[in-house]
């Protein structure tokens, strides 16, 4: 297994997924072996934040989480959730508002519900000192309209699992957003366009994430592994370092510092 001399920070892992949670001890052991020092457990529903706390209690120096409603779950969001979210935001283990945003690719929630839910999250973020962990898929126009209205009022923003085009990237960077890159960049078909785009991301705005158990890096040496996990973050780092022709440990240090600064850790 590859190793990193420099500490690594996985800004987005779905550790509540049964593929990872049922093997939690092994997943954490492998993460530490690959020098993963910090992991953000992605919450896609307020219930996830409560469940994540149970895992965080087992690894309080390694794990943190977010609070929010994924656009797929926007139909479940109610205004009454805001007070509960505010209470959760008072805890040190909650490091961002999200995962929230817009996803028009599948529309598990209506566009109306998604826009309402996302707007409420943006309004919440203007009242507290936490950054936002955002999701966008096939919804660039509405997403950017809302970001332009609120981005100057919130602490910080990361567009997680960026897979879009140069126009969207430019819009996000113009608004001061951080960019989260996953194993998508290693996909020779779907992700090849990112090889060019990543050179436009300023070094102080780049972060990396596994989005595990999804998006297994294509440069992972063992084929047919059933699920991705945080320990594989090193393969995303390797790919980016090769694309940018940059020393891996220097790149890792920059990304780690960006992530700690963003999440105030």
Which residues fall in each region the model found?
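Mid-domain alpha/beta scaffold segments of enzyme catalytic cores
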Residues: 1-265
């Amino acid at each position: 297994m590859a190793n990193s001399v420099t500490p690594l920070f996985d800004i987005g892992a779905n550790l509540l997924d049964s593929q990872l949670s049922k093997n939690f001890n092994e997943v954490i052991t492998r993460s530490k072996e690959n020098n993963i020092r910090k992991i953000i457990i992605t919450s896609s529903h307020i219930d996830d934040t409560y469940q994540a706390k149970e895992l965080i209690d087992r690894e309080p120096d390694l794990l943190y989480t977010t609070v929010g409603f994924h656009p797929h779950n926007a139909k479940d969001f109610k205004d009454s959730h805001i007070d509960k979210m505010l209470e959760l935001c008072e805890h040190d283990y909650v490091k961002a508002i999200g995962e929230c945003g817009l996803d028009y690719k599948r529309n598990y929630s209506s566009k109306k519900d998604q826009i309402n839910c996302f707007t409420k999250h943006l309004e919440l973020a203007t009242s507290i000192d936490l950054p936002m962990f955002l999701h966008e898929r096939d919804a660039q126009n509405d997403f950017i309209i809302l970001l332009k209205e609120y981005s100057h009022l919130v602490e910080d923003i990361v567009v997680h699992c960026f897979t879009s085009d140069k126009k969207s990237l430019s819009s996000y960077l113009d608004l001061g957003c951080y960019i989260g890159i996953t194993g998508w960049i290693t996909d020779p078909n779907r992700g090849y366009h990112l090889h060019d785009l990543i050179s436009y991301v300023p070094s102080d705005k780049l972060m990396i994430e596994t989005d595990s158990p999804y998006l297994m890096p294509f440069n992972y040496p063992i084929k047919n592994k059933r699920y991705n996990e945080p320990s594989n973050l090193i393969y995303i780092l390797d790919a980016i370092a090769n694309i940018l022709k940059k020393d891996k440990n220097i790149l890792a240090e920059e990304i780690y510092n960006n992530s700690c600064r963003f999440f105030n850790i």
